[in-house]
Amino acid sequence: MKIIETKNLNYSYTQSSIRSIENVNFSVLDGEWITIVGKNGSGKSTLIRLLDGLLKADSGKIIIDGLTLSEKTLWEIRKKIGIVFQNPDNQFVSGSVIEDVAFGMENYQIPQEEMLVRAQQALKTVGMIDFAEKSPVRLSGGQKQRVAIAGVLAIQPKILILDEAASMLDPDGRDEVWQTIKKLKEQQNLTVISVNHDLNELNLSDRVILLNDGKIAADTKINQLFSDSELLSKNDLKLPFLQQLQKDLRESGINFTQEYNHQRELVNFLWKSISGT
């Protein structure tokens, strides 16, 4: 079942004759994980802001969980979508972690007692309940993003959108965030849309949408994207380390029966090849 669908979507920023989003058509299935990639200025962040109604399309249609986005349905649709942005510090407004998670529910007229229960449950879900009374400023980057994710989960959305949510973190922090999202998707059957410029972080995605100058240049599986060197080059994208390594090994004479998207799988394959087992 489609939970998101766009039809002939167009958008231009005020006083600009150039369309930031042009004739965009795509759909997302319930429970699917889609990653939107593209170089800077390709329209990635503009597109997700259109999906949530933060920006109003010039023309076209957006359908979220059976509702066509309009002024009348805007708040109902926003209840279905949670967005985590790039910089978690910009999302904190309270003195303690649990107050901050509860704050986001005030706009939804949720009773005070229920807000506290939801906030505690969301913090447990992301593994941050032990930090409930701490100040957000004392947390690491990865911990801050987990709290930001908890704030979104407390609203109980069906769709989770991550706008470069791990790009400012160190490798450990990024892994912390992606593993949290993976667990949540599996437990709650969330639909996930992540915006990313780093192809190294696509392995959890079911599908990839590549934007170029506001248009969809490709809507494909990960391995199909990685195998199209011309498409990657045109869009200033580089193969992730793991895929580049496999490409180099093929050229050196090692035959692969499949493409490996995880380091451990590749290491196991190479070990068996070398040992002859």
Swiss-Prot record:
CDD domains cross-referenced by the UniProt entry: ABC_cobalt_CbiO_domain1
Subcellular location: Cell membrane
Functional summary from the UniProt entry: ATP-binding (A) component of a common energy-coupling factor (ECF) ABC-transporter complex. Unlike classic ABC transporters this ECF transporter provides the energy necessary to transport a number of different substrates.
Organism: Oenococcus oeni (strain ATCC BAA-331 / PSU-1)
Similarity comment: family membership: Belongs to the ABC transporter superfamily. Energy-coupling factor EcfA family.
Membrane-protein topology: Peripheral membrane protein
Residue ranges annotated for the ABC transporter domain, each copy included: 4-238
The encoding gene: ecfA1
Listed name of the protein: Energy-coupling factor transporter ATP-binding protein EcfA1
PANTHER family per record: ENERGY-COUPLING FACTOR TRANSPORTER ATP-BINDING PROTEIN ECFA1, HEAVY METAL TRANSPORTER
Subunit and interaction comment: Forms a stable energy-coupling factor (ECF) transporter complex composed of 2 membrane-embedded substrate-binding proteins (S component), 2 ATP-binding proteins (A component) and 2 transmembrane proteins (T component).
One GO MF term attached to the UniProt entry: ATPase-coupled transmembrane transporter activity
NCBIfam families xref list: ECF_ATPase_1, PRK13648.1
UniProt superkingdom: Bacteria
Enzyme Commission number(s): 7.-.-.-
Lineage: Bacteria, Bacillati, Bacillota, Bacilli, Lactobacillales
Binding sites annotated in the UniProt record for ATP: 38-45
Keyword list, A-Z: ATP-binding, Cell membrane, Membrane, Nucleotide-binding, Translocase, Transport
GO CC terms in record: ATP-binding cassette (ABC) transporter complex
